[in-house]
């Protein structure tokens, strides 16, 4: 099993690791597409400041698109011994492109990656919820139109009193 980035030279007790890490790897699968999008933006910036060549950028973007497609289809997996989604993406890139794949983390901390992934994931979820609420709103409006002539007989468990002010 590969050594985790945070282990350094100390072996962590497996019970403590299970308690603190829990289902992180499982939950990271939800972040895979967002991690890839963040990496695409980051490497575009790296190329713009001269840390990647145009050719390296093209190769990385092509492979990141493949990884994104894999995540879209639900086929993206974090292999046993791989710490998290960020490490898995880098591993996939280095397997396919060699040392070019290692360059995606230049000038970016893991905390930056985690924060961006969570923000993108949250934004996507909020958008989906807003769309569902809008659909519900339209259903309720249609129902209210359909039943507008039926008088209300009870409100809050009490007989309804119609007022004509």
Q: Over which residues does each language-model region extend?
A:
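A short, hydrophobic C-terminal helix/tail in secreted or cell-surface proteins
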Residues: 159-165
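A helix-coil-helix interface module used to build multimeric assemblies
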Residues: 1-158
């Amino acid at each position: 099993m590969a050594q985790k980035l945070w282990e350094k030279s100390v072996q962590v007790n497996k019970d403590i690791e299970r308690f603190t890490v829990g289902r992180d790897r499982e939950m990271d699968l939800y972040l895979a597409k967002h991690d890839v999008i963040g990496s695409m933006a980051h490497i575009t910036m790296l190329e713009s400041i001269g840390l990647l060549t145009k050719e390296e950028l093209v190769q990385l973007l092509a492979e990141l698109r493949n990884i994104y497609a894999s995540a879209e289809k639900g086929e993206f997996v974090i292999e046993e011994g791989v710490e998290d989604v960020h490490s898995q993406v880098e591993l996939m890139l280095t397997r396919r492109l060699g040392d070019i794949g290692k360059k995606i983390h230049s000038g970016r901390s893991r905390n930056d990656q985690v924060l961006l992934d969570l923000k993108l994931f949250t934004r996507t979820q909020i958008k989906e919820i807003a769309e569902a609420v809008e659909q519900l709103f339209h259903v309720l409006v249609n129902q209210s139109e359909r039943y507008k002539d039926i008088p209300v007989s009870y409100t809050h468990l009490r007989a309804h009193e119609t007022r004509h002010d």
